[in-house]
Amino acid sequence: MSEVSQTVASERRSLWDSVKPYFEKESLAAFFVGVSSGFPFAMIGATLTTRLAQDGISKKTVTAFTLAFLVYNLKFLWAWVIDGVRLPVIGRLGQRVSWMLVAGLFVMAAVINLAMVDPKADIAWTATSAILVGMAGATFDIVIDAYRIETLKPYQLGVGSGMSQYGWRIGSTAAGAIALVLAARYDWSIAYMACALLALPAMLTALILGEPPRHRDPIERKGFKAGFNAIAGPFVEFFKRSGAWLVLLFILVHKIGDTLGQLVLRLLLNDMGYTNDEIAIWDVGVGFWAFLIGIFVGGVLYSKLGLKRSVLIALVLMGVSNASYAVLANFGHSNIGLGLTQGFENFSSGIGGVVVVAYFSALCDLRFTATQYALISAAASVVGRLITGTTAGAMVEDFGYVNFYIFTTVIAIPGIILFWWMSRIGLIDAAMGTAGGGKDGNPETPH
């Protein structure tokens, strides 16, 4: 074989080696469960914000609805049930598979219920229905995250997290776009009922692939003490690690600014006079593709730079991206401006979605996957959601959108500094769980 032929063959192998991990069954499973994970969030997030704003509900009331997201932040309280309680009859399908089916049906029922409410006639029942969707979506997320982490091998966490984020964004974007288009042509009830079908990809994936290979069957426990240990065990194990409290502090503060900015975004766009079609094209459409590109770049950064450096880069980009909303608010209605702003923000979020989720997944102990990841993911946005639901609306009304988004940029700085410091003193590696190759796990995961 000539030198040129060898070079071409080598380049082809290199290209295939780069693409191949995305087509492994574990990565594809992460993608499809991610689709179903994303859509309930959209149903009580930007989509519901738009629906309420168009119904003339006040800003303070609309932002108060984001408290429904706090249910996601409390999911660690019942995540132990998903880890340790075996369902009767259907449980023969496997612990994760059976819970995936039950949680999926719960989500579909809750979304259909929210479809039937009239916010103008009964705002209290609308709020209750949104909370029910939050509870169902949070339970679905517990199962989905555990299924993803236990399906992926340690070396697949980067690619798998990327595929999960691809799926999450497609699910949330599809739900948002479908809801906007159908609501503009029919009504919000039809829009929400159509979106309920997005629970099916995760349910079908679990049925087809079956139980994750790394899942450890629940241990039969009897008595009060044994039951208490089943609940407390995952938390005790996590906090016994070196630097666990600092890791938790980072999880709590790293995303405050990003959470605040995103949950108020649709209010900004509504006040700037953007139509549903403009939002669908320039916000949802451009943002969608920018996010996908960001996910790809995030996967490259993770594989080339390792976990610590790639996470630090992502944190800086996500913090700076919020400042672009202050620029948009200052210059006023502009479709190109909205496209550029959403492009930058979603590109940054795509990178962060891969590397930060990979880091959080690696923190889990495989004995307590559902409970520990529920704790980590819930803590990641609880502060931002609490501030949004209690004071964000008043902050916008008192200080204006420009100053509000400058504030969200500034409060991203502590999380960046904390992660940099933990990397310098070795706490990132010391706190790693078995899912990421720590302790008795596979040490090949890039840190």
Across the structure, where does each feature detected by a protein language model lie?
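Juxtamembrane intracellular "pre-TM" segments in multi-pass secondary transporters
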Residues: 6-23, 214-246
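Glycine-rich segments within core transmembrane alpha-helices of 12-TM secondary carriers
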Residues: 72-75, 158-177, 183, 377-388
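Helix-to-loop junctions at the C-terminal end of transmembrane segments
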Residues: 75-92, 293-310, 396-397
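C-terminal ends and interior cores of transmembrane alpha-helices
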Residues: 99-120, 316-333
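Symmetry-related core transmembrane helices of the 12-TM Major Facilitator Superfamily/SLC fold
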Residues: 102-108, 190-208, 403-421
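C-terminal transmembrane helical hairpin of 12-TM major facilitator-type secondary transporters
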Residues: 309-356
